[in-house]
């Protein structure tokens, strides 16, 4: 997910995206803890996407 794609979304869409990412992050962490996760790079990707969305929400709140 690119930052430019996220910038085009509204605050409501960003909140929905954040909720989906947090759910995905939780599921990935559970898979990793149980040893079922093969693609460990997904944890890093999702964590950074969460940070991107939170950053944009903060920017939009200030503007």
Curated annotation (Swiss-Prot):
Keywords: Ribonucleoprotein, Ribosomal protein. Belongs to the universal ribosomal protein uL29 family. The gene is rpmC. The keyword Ribosomal protein applies. GO terms for cellular component: cytosolic large ribosomal subunit. The lineage of its organism: Bacteria, Pseudomonadati, Pseudomonadota, Gammaproteobacteria, Enterobacterales. CDD domains: Ribosomal_L29_HIP (cd00427). One of its GO terms (biological process) is translation. This is Large ribosomal subunit protein uL29. Disulfide bonds: none annotated. It holds the Pfam family Ribosomal_L29.
């Amino acid at each position: 997910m690119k930052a430019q794609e996220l910038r085009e979304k509204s605050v409501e869409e960003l909140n929905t995206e954040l909720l989906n990412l947090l759910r995905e992050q939780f599921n990935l962490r559970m898979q990793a803890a149980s040893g079922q996760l093969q693609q460990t790079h997904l944890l890093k990707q999702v964590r950074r996407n969460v940070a991107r969305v939170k950053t944009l929400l903060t920017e939009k709140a200030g503007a």
